[in-house]
């Protein structure tokens, strides 16, 4: 147990917070190039084929990103924008691809919650 005088001289070390999205390097989003586009199966109680992409970012990290929405046009060498946000039932997937920007087109025939999927307003 330190004395008051020792605490006045040195103080206590603050525990450093661990970043949940280290590959973004403090940025809100990062641009990257798809290295591999594939499907993955979720953890135990769930069952599906989730669409994911391995992306090499401008911060020189390579991360696994989730492709949200129904249907996509991504393939190898597609340029995408990556944001933070994990997928709870896919281990190791801590990033999302932003739909409607760069090479990732918005979801077709989307009427509600359009902004999350880069869909234009239906006319």
Swiss-Prot record:
Instruction: Please explain the role this protein plays, according to its UniProt record.
Output: With S4 and S5 plays an important role in translational accuracy. Interacts with and stabilizes bases of the 16S rRNA that are involved in tRNA selection in the A site and with the mRNA backbone. Located at the interface of the 30S and 50S subunits, it traverses the body of the 30S subunit contacting proteins on the other side and probably holding the rRNA structure together. The combined cluster of proteins S8, S12 and S17 appears to hold together the shoulder and platform of the 30S subunit.
GO CC, sorted alphabetically, is: small ribosomal subunit
Q: Which SUPFAM superfamilies match?
A: Nucleic acid-binding proteins
Its family remark reads: Belongs to the universal ribosomal protein uS12 family.
Q: Which domain of life is it from?
A: Bacteria
Name the gene behind this protein.
rpsL
Pfam families this protein is in?
A: Ribosom_S12_S23 (PF00164)
Task: Tell me how this protein assembles.
Answer: Part of the 30S ribosomal subunit. Contacts proteins S8 and S17. May interact with IF1 in the 30S initiation complex.
User: Which residues are annotated as modified residue 3-methylthioaspartic acid in the UniProt record?
Assistant: 89
> Cross-referenced NCBIfam families, in alphabetical order?
rpsL_bact
| Record-linked InterPro entries | NA-bd_OB-fold, Ribosomal_uS12, Ribosomal_uS12_bac
Q: What is this protein called?
A: Small ribosomal subunit protein uS12
Instruction: Spell out the PANTHER family in the cross-references.
Output: 30S RIBOSOMAL PROTEIN S12 FAMILY MEMBER
* Molecular function GO labels: rRNA binding; structural constituent of ribosome; tRNA binding
Does the keyword field hold Ligase?
no
Q: Which UniProt keywords apply?
A: Methylation, Ribonucleoprotein, Ribosomal protein, RNA-binding, rRNA-binding, tRNA-binding
Q: Which GO terms describe its biological process?
A: translation
